[in-house]
């Protein structure tokens, strides 16, 4: 391993730990709505759970606006992250690193992570995430909503609003494998 690649690996590991720390800080004990996005941004200063993000924070802004019915600003992001926690809304990424690989490669780990989080509802954001993860999550008996939600960028903002609002209203089908023989 060269000195350059070693330094790059350290930077990436530090960035991952920072993302994990902030995400844990804003996770509630019980998750009502789990949002699964594609991957964290490659820019190290941007992430859904960072309280200070100066540019390109559209996923956070649209989720906060639709869930909390409040207008997000750069100044109130920390408060809105706390309110999302109180609303039991939590976001994870299909890939824990900025995307490097086929989406399907990350699905088995995603299923395990989602089982541990045990949410009441799962909303998949972005078509490739839906295409890779919907069937495996559903087949695993997890409460995934069958709504394809686009990422709120590149002109898809209005489509995101419509699809995400619909996904929030729908109740996922009760998955048989989540029931015990006694109760279900």
Indicate residue ranges for each PLM-predicted region.
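Compositionally biased, intrinsically disordered low-complexity regions enriched in proline and serine
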Residues: 48-50, 161, 180
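Polar low-complexity intrinsically disordered regions
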Residues: 1-4, 119, 177-184
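A polyampholytic, Gly/Pro-enriched intrinsically disordered region
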Residues: 163-184
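A polyanion-binding, active-site-adjacent surface
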Residues: 2-154
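Short, charged, surface-exposed secondary-structure boundary motifs
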Residues: 153-163
